Amino acid sequence: MSAHQARKRFGQHFLTDESVVESIVRAIGPARDDRVVEIGPGLSALTRPLLDRIDHLTAVEIDRDLAARLRRQYPAERLTVVEADALTVDFAQFGQGLRVVGNLPYNISSPLLFHLMGAAEQVRDQHFMLQREVIDRMVAEPGSGDYSRLSVMLQARYRMEKLFDVAPEAFDPPPRVVSAVVRMAPLPADRLRPASDAAFETVVARAFSQRRKMLRRVLDDWAALTPWDELGIAPTARAEEVGVAQFIGLADALLAAGAPGLARP
């Protein structure tokens, strides 16, 4: 086995359970000519079986030692190694129809999910291993304790499905939390979408800044500009009770009313 030591600063937990690897690859269902990008290949647990099924793979790896190892293990015509922090990579550069996969570092999972939204037009689907708690928030419904800003922002852009849990023992070193695998497929171009992505993001962030308080109080100076009845939002509603479509309507209404602090598209 490799002498490579997991580096805490990179949030490294290497997947070692072959049955879990097989389940992930089966869920992805790669075809020979698929355009696949793997984030954080680590010790190649997913890289190997993916390359058994596809012609070429692009891997994004921040750890220079692991990047060098990958270059030694696989020929350049089969594997392109991008040695970089995934948070700085423009995934749109890899072309259309991308299938993005990876055992994501848990310490940057939410920022990375938001970063990847910028390339959603180029993406066919995404399959990620994440902390189970994060995935529960991603797929949560309004009214549940897990429903959050992350839920709203991602559900406005993706159709998501939690596939299965993964025990800590499947990793080396084992994390202190249970993991899970999620499938994310970008919604079509004709989806319900806000007039301004920036305004939508601002409104959702402000709404969840005090999630237990009534939304009218949290929005404060915007409350008088909001057509509450038209949006179907109850006077006592909290952010965690408001659906994605209602948040899109809320952001659009505030933008149209000239609410201060909202950037026009």
Curated annotation (Swiss-Prot):
Catalytic activity as recorded in UniProt: adenosine(1518)/adenosine(1519) in 16S rRNA + 4 S-adenosyl-L-methionine = N(6)-dimethyladenosine(1518)/N(6)-dimethyladenosine(1519) in 16S rRNA + 4 S-adenosyl-L-homocysteine + 4 H(+)
Protein name (record): Ribosomal RNA small subunit methyltransferase A
Assigned keywords, A-Z: Cytoplasm, Methyltransferase, RNA-binding, rRNA processing, S-adenosyl-L-methionine, Transferase
Residues holding S-adenosyl-L-methionine: 13, 15, 40, 61, 85, 103
Family: Belongs to the class I-like SAM-binding methyltransferase superfamily. rRNA adenine N(6)-methyltransferase family. RsmA subfamily.
EC number: 2.1.1.182
Subcellular compartments: Cytoplasm
Chief subcellular location: cytoplasm
Lineage of source species: Bacteria, Pseudomonadati, Pseudomonadota, Betaproteobacteria, Burkholderiales
Pfam families, per the entry: RrnaAD
PROSITE patterns membership: RRNA_A_DIMETH, SAM_RNA_A_N6_MT
Disulphide bond pairs: none
The encoding gene: rsmA
UniProt-recorded Gene Ontology molecular function terms: 16S rRNA (adenine(1518)-N(6)/adenine(1519)-N(6))-dimethyltransferase activity; RNA binding
GO cellular component: cytosol
Function: Specifically dimethylates two adjacent adenosines (A1518 and A1519) in the loop of a conserved hairpin near the 3'-end of 16S rRNA in the 30S particle. May play a critical role in biogenesis of 30S subunits.
